[in-house]
Structure formats: structure tokens, C-alpha cells
Curated annotation (Swiss-Prot):
It is found in: Cell inner membrane. Belongs to the UPF0161 family. NCBIfam families: membrane protein insertion efficiency factor YidD. This is Putative membrane protein insertion efficiency factor. One of its GO terms (cellular component) is plasma membrane. Keywords: Cell inner membrane, Cell membrane, Membrane. Could be involved in insertion of integral membrane proteins into the membrane. It is a peripheral membrane protein. It comes from Prochlorococcus marinus (strain SARG / CCMP1375 / SS120). Pfam families: YidD (PF01809).
Length: 79
């Protein structure tokens, strides 16, 4: 039961990221300061760590993506 709930939540998060990539990102243009981009990071983090830890890692990454932090390579941590 827990695995099904986690799968549903993962799919919801991934759908939100796909929506952002398809509809919002083209309007805003490239703005991410990191490699991989924040949306790529989010997909990888959720696929690698699941919806809870992956979502938390993605949220922390989004908060770091601003002009006050240095840019560059910032991969998803291993398990």
C-alpha cells in the first residue's frame, strides 16, 4: 500500500515538472544557474530517492537557484 502511495506521489511530482518544462519554462527562457538544470535535478532526485527525499532535495535545490549563490555543477547525491 505504501509503495502504491509513493508511486502516485512520484508520478504527481514528475507530472508537475513535465508541465513546467512544457508550458512555463518556454515562456521564461533559460534561467537555471546549475548543471543539471533544476527540473532535470528534480526528475533524477525523485527517480533515485523517491517522492519524499527526492522532493526535499529538489526543494532545497530550487531555493539555492538564485543570484546570491554560486552556479555550476550540482549533481543529485547518491543514496
Amino acid at each position: 500500500m505504501i509503495k502504491k502511495i509513493n508511486a502516485v506521489i512520484s508520478n504527481l511530482f514528475l507530472t508537475l515538472i513535465r508541465f513546467y518544462r512544457s508550458w512555463i519554462s518556454p515562456l521564461l527562457g533559460p534561467s537555471c544557474r546549475f548543471v543539471p538544470t533544476c527540473s532535470e535535478y528534480g526528475v533524477e532526485a525523485i527517480e533515485k530517492h523517491g517522492p519524499w527525499k527526492g522532493g526535499w532535495l529538489t526543494l532545497k535545490r530550487l531555493l539555492r537557484c538564485n543570484p546570491l549563490t554560486p552556479c555550476g555543477y550540482d549533481p543529485v547525491p547518491d543514496k
